[in-house]
Amino acid sequence: MSKAPEDQRPMPRRPAAFSLEEPSSSPARPPFAEAQEPQRRAPKSFDANVTITPDAEDPFLAGLSEDEAILPIARPAKRRFSFGKLAGAAFGALASFAIGLWIDDLIRDLFTRADWLGYTALTLLGIGLLALTVVVIRELAGIYRLNAVQAIKQRASALSLQGTASEARKLVKDVEDLTQHRAETARGRSVLKAAENDIIDAPHLIALAERELLAPLDAKARSLIINASKRVSVVTAVSPRALVDLAYVLFEVVRLVRAMAELYGGRPGSIGMLRLLRDVFAHLAVTGSIAIGDGLAQQVLGHGLASRLSARLGEGVINGLMTARIGIAAMDLCRPLEFKALRRPGIGDFMPALKPAINPDSKAL
């Protein structure tokens, strides 16, 4: 084995001494760290006057049109003492006495003619009274269900501000019982059942119930309103007489309000239906919501569109929008929980459904 020549061997390094700097107490930071951290400002006091501008005087909020603003929520009218109701009850009782005396005299006369006629009249009277009792019980049950919906809504509003989880669970159970007849709420009921042992405060539990139970019902309610508005718009556009328009609009409104009440568990009878219709129209009369907003009217009839549309078609669109507004008011009254976790629908949400009817270039025309 041959050795490497001496001139090619590496020179050994001689020992040397080095001075080590003492480590600093804080670790070194990269040069860009100071740029990333915001500089803290020492607290100061300001003597400038702060003026709060009310919403009514705010120029950025004053320009909102009626359609962009939040529509008023329909609420049931307060029950007050009325002399008209008192007079109606008094004359109704008097008429009942008169009918009772007439029936008594009739049965007595039938017994004087023949016994079998008297017994037949008594049997018919018993059948009639039994049927009347069933009708009265159904009407009272319908009114009770409507009152229960409003009671649940008031309890939910109070518990959303201040309430315990146990009270909120009782409220959610009442809402489940009210809507269990609808197959759309099956998934929501299973979600709420799975969350029974979870720790949830009252407002969030009510919001969860609204999203899981009422969201599918709200979608169904929207479809009911859209279909009713379309039918009213088309019938108004093709009907030959204004009386036909009015009759069909009233028929469609009554059917829409009844379907809305049955959807949310109200299921009113005839008397309860009249009461619900009175609350709906009272809300629309007080708020002036039957008339559409300037922005929406300009969208439907403005920009030269009125000159290209027939008068009947314009009336059909307006009646369809009015039907949609009535449907929204009925939705507010029949819904067991107010719109908080979910967005409340507005008239603008139903405009796309009526757009084929107001578009002059549409094939529907």
Curated annotation (Swiss-Prot):
Record region (Disordered): 1-47
Keyword annotations of the record: Cell inner membrane, Cell membrane, Membrane, Transmembrane, Transmembrane helix
Xref: Pfam families: DUF697
This protein's record includes keyword Translocase: no
InterPro entries associated with the record: DUF697, UPF0283
GO cellular component, one term: plasma membrane
Predominant location: membrane
Keyword Transmembrane applies: yes
Regions of compositional bias (Basic and acidic residues) in chain numbering: 1-10
Localization (cell): Cell inner membrane
Transmembrane region(s): 83-103, 117-137
Topological relation to the membrane, as annotated: Multi-pass membrane protein
Similarity comment: family membership: Belongs to the UPF0283 family.
Listed name of the protein: UPF0283 membrane protein Avi_2471
Organism expressing this protein natively: Allorhizobium ampelinum (strain ATCC BAA-846 / DSM 112012 / S4) (Agrobacterium vitis (strain S4))
